[in-house]
């Protein structure tokens, strides 16, 4: 919307009692981000834009999340919950600054897109004073109907007040609105509370606009995009819709998914070219996967960076702070945390690598554990380039294994190992010839029944 300034207000003051949760409704996650984060991310950004969030009293966590997602956000408190128009006026100070466009969105509609919010501003540039977002409902029962005449919105009719003909209308009110900034404040301030609940409803703005001889318009979108979240069941439905959207975007970008419906992505997952994701993979927030990488089945990744042609899994868990270099391998039943594996490093089986740096082309044998925690603090393990750690070894941090060094299988390493050295830290093997035969004979003799 070139040349037009815009203020977006996101209403996030609801208690969300039907969620039956101590967590504020808008802080529940969909695809690894809070409901509020999705809406704030979709809001217009850049030069000429401003953003406000209206939160409930005592909901500092909601305000903190808003500032975390969009540091430019202004936060306002709605001290009494007296309807949507009352909530908007909690941000009166921001509205009074006089942006060209005012967009009002809801913090519990995580599927709303930036494109839809941008489309709502176009009729304002063409002269409309109010734009309402609508959708065609598969079952419109309970929704306010949008009454349109010759392309102009004339009314929002609630279910209880609708005639039989009006109830047959499937175009429904999504709640999201955009106002011409020059007249927005005076229109919203005219909204009264002469209704059974004594609340101030934003939907009444339509009649005020019409009575003032101004124009109201409708922009349509899909029903999925404007799903509001009020229950855990609706949260699960939104997750399903979002995952379908993310999978399609990934497939369209060239990611190979053997069984897409079994793969779960985060909203911020980033893929390179020729990435392959096998069935039953869960990717949490903060994951980037570079060209040619393969994520094998039953792997779980969060806040991890996967390098070119790297391989993960099957049955691998990559926790925050994991970084795999080009061609690195993390195999089956391996867990990593705050671990850097340089190019070509291999951790193929049954291993825990935490608070560690593994040099290029190092090989970590099956059953190796970096013992990084002593009950009070975490300590680092450094493994040099080309080092070889034998199976079933314990590396007691803080410890350094030098470049090219070998650690014998079954070792407990408590001191630094120099470059190209061999470290063996285990008991010496003892062999007793014939011991097993004598042991068996003794046990069998003891089992024979005693005779009187």
Swiss-Prot record:
It catalyses: alpha-D-glucosamine 1-phosphate + acetyl-CoA = N-acetyl-alpha-D-glucosamine 1-phosphate + CoA + H(+); N-acetyl-alpha-D-glucosamine 1-phosphate + UTP + H(+) = UDP-N-acetyl-alpha-D-glucosamine + diphosphate. This is Bifunctional protein GlmU. The keyword Nucleotide-binding does not apply. Pfam families: Hexapep (PF00132), NTP_transf_3 (PF12804). Its EC number is 2.7.7.23, 2.3.1.157. The gene is glmU. The keyword Oxidoreductase does not apply. Catalyzes the last two sequential reactions in the de novo biosynthetic pathway for UDP-N-acetylglucosamine (UDP-GlcNAc). The C-terminal domain catalyzes the transfer of acetyl group from acetyl coenzyme A to glucosamine-1-phosphate (GlcN-1-P) to produce N-acetylglucosamine-1-phosphate (GlcNAc-1-P), which is converted into UDP-GlcNAc by the transfer of uridine 5-monophosphate (from uridine 5-triphosphate), a reaction catalyzed by the N-terminal domain.
């Amino acid at each position: 919307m070139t040349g037009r300034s815009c203020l977006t207000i996101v209403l996030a003051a609801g208690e969300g009692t039907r969620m039956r949760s101590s967590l504020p409704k808008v802080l529940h996650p969909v695809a690894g981000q809070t409901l509020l984060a999705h809406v704030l991310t979709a809001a217009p950004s850049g030069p000429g834009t401003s953003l406000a969030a209206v939160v409930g009293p005592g909901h500092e966590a909601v305000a903190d999340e808003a500032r975390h997602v969009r540091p430019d956000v202004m936060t306002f408190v709605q001290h009494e919950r007296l309807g949507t128009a009352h909530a908007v006026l909690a941000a009166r100070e921001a509205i009074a600054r006089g942006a060209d466009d005012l967009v009002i969105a809801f913090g519990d509609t995580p599927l709303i897109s930036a494109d839809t919010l941008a489309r709502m501003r176009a009729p304002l540039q063409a002269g409309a004073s109010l734009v309402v977002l609508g959708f065609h409902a598969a079952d419109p029962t309970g929704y306010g109907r949008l009454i349109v005449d010759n392309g102009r919105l004339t009314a929002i009719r609630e279910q209880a007040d609708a005639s039989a003909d009006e109830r047959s209308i499937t175009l429904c009110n999504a709640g999201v609105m955009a106002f011409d900034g020059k007249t927005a404040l005076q229109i919203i301030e005219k909204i009264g509370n002469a209704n059974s609940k004594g609340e101030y409803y934003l939907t009444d703005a339509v009649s005020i606009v019409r009575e003032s001889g101004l124009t109201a318009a409708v922009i349509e979108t899909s029903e999925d995009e404007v799903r509001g979240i009020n229950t855990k069941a609706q949260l699960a439905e939104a997750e399903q819709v979002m995952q379908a959207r993310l999978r399609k975007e990934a497939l369209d970008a060239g990611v190979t998914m053997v069984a897409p419906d079994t793969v779960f992505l985060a909203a911020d997952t980033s893929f390179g070219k020729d990435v392959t994701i096998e069935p039953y993979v869960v990717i949490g927030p903060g994951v980037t996967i570079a060209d040619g990488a393969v994520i094998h089945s039953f792997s779980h990744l969060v806040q991890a960076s996967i390098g070119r042609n790297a391989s993960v899994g099957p049955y691998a868990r990559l926790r925050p702070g994991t970084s795999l270099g080009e061609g690195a391998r993390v195999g089956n039943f391996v867990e990593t945390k705050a671990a850097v594996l340089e190019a070509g490093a291999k951790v193929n089986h049954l291993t825990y690598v935490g608070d560690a740096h593994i040099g290029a082309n190092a090989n970590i044998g099956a059953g190796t554990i970096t013992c990084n925690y002593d009950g009070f603090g975490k300590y680092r393990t450094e493994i040099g380039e080309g080092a070889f750690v034998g199976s079933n070894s314990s590396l007691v941090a803080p410890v350094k294994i030098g470049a090219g060094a070998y650690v014998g299988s079954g070792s407990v390493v408590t001191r630094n190992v120099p470059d190209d050295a061999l470290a063996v830290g285990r008991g010496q093997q003892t062999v007793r010839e014939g011991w097993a035969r004598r042991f068996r004979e003794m046990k069998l003799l003891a089992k024979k029944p005693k005779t009187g």
